[in-house]
Swiss-Prot record:
Residues the record lists as binding ATP: 38-45
Organism: Pseudomonas savastanoi pv. phaseolicola (strain 1448A / Race 6)
Protein family (similarity comment): Belongs to the ABC transporter superfamily. Zinc importer (TC 3.A.1.15.5) family.
Organism ancestry: Bacteria, Pseudomonadati, Pseudomonadota, Gammaproteobacteria, Pseudomonadales
GO molecular function, one term: ABC-type zinc transporter activity
GO biological process: response to zinc ion
UniProt xrefs under SMART domains: AAA (SM00382)
Protein name as it appears in the record: Zinc import ATP-binding protein ZnuC
Primary site of residence: membrane
Entry EC number(s): 7.2.2.20
Keyword Iron-sulfur attributed: no
Protein localization: Cell inner membrane
């Protein structure tokens, strides 16, 4: 798997004496979209932090391609309502970014009209596009998107997932995405990893949606809806740090597998 951008092998994390992640195996290749799904408390945010290098696993390894450029899009941005901050000034917090670079990134995500708007005054969908534009400013080889459609209506969610696919196609970057809605990402993602502190099952989304481990986690409606209700319990500051954090179509083919700790066939 030398062509991987990032690879996790037997990763385990314990926080406050409790196992949060156990024996995680995961990799993302260039041009591949991998989606993490799982209930609240499944360890998705912890896994993302391990991928970003913000948290060191207690055991196992996190291998990254040397000098890997990563663009990160947090779930939610916490901005003081009294802070005079335009979208342009927010994007220019990224070192080396001028107005031209900011405009170019916003055009890529279809949000160029908000460049001079106060960041507190834009809509939820516009905010997600601005956060995505900020991730693109780093010219990433790997995009890490933590709930990229958070706070967006269903129509807007489908548009954003389509945009993510187009960006993947254009830049041939790998994408690691956390999502709560397998139904909407069915045509976007190449591989789904169902997480509940360990990898319950993984593979093509259509296969995972019928897997007993997936159905057990998400209930009897899982096969038709593949959805659960996400309760967002934390936000991020301007630099992506967690505030009050709690402990496509593609030619890629994947084998549908179960995690080591699953009791499903």
């Amino acid at each position: 798997m030398t062509d991987a951008l990032i690879r996790l092998e037997q990763v385990a994390v314990t926080l406050s004496g409790q196992s949060v992640l156990d024996n995680i195996q995961l990799s993302v290749k260039p041009g591949e979209i991998v989606t993490l799904i799982g209930p609240n408390g499944a360890g998705k945010t912890t896994l993302v932090r391990a991928v970003l290098g913000l948290l060191k696993p207690d055991s196992g390894t996190v291998w990254r391609k040397p000098k890997l450029r990563v663009g990160y899009m947090p779930q939610k941005l916490h901005v003081d309502q009294t802070l005079p901050l335009s979208v342009l000034r927010f994007l220019r917090l990224v070192p080396g970014v001028d107005r031209m670079a900011a405009e170019s990134a916003l055009e890529e995500v279809g949000a160029e009209k908000v460049i001079d708007s106060p960041i507190q005054g834009i809509s939820g969908g516009e905010m997600q596009r601005v956060l995505l534009a900020r991730a693109l400013l780093r010219k990433p080889e790997l995009l890490v998107l933590d709930e990229p459609v958070q706070g967006v209506d269903v129509a807007g969610q489908a548009e954003l997932y389509g945009l993510i696919t187009r960006l993947r196609d254009r830049h041939q970057c790998g994408v690691l995405m956390v999502s709560h809605d397998l139904h909407l990402v069915m045509s976007t993602t190449d591989q789904v990893v169902c997480l509940n502190r360990h990898v319950c099952c993984s593979g093509h989304p259509e296969h995972v949606s019928h897997d007993p481990a997936f159905v057990e986690l998400f209930g009897k409606n899982a096969q038709s809806l593949a959805i659960y209700h996400h309760h967002h319990d934390h936000a991020h500051d301007l630099h992506g740090a967690v505030v009050n954090d709690a402990p496509a179509t593609s030619s890629h083919t994947h084998t549908h597998v179960h995690g080591d700790h699953c009791k499903h066939g």
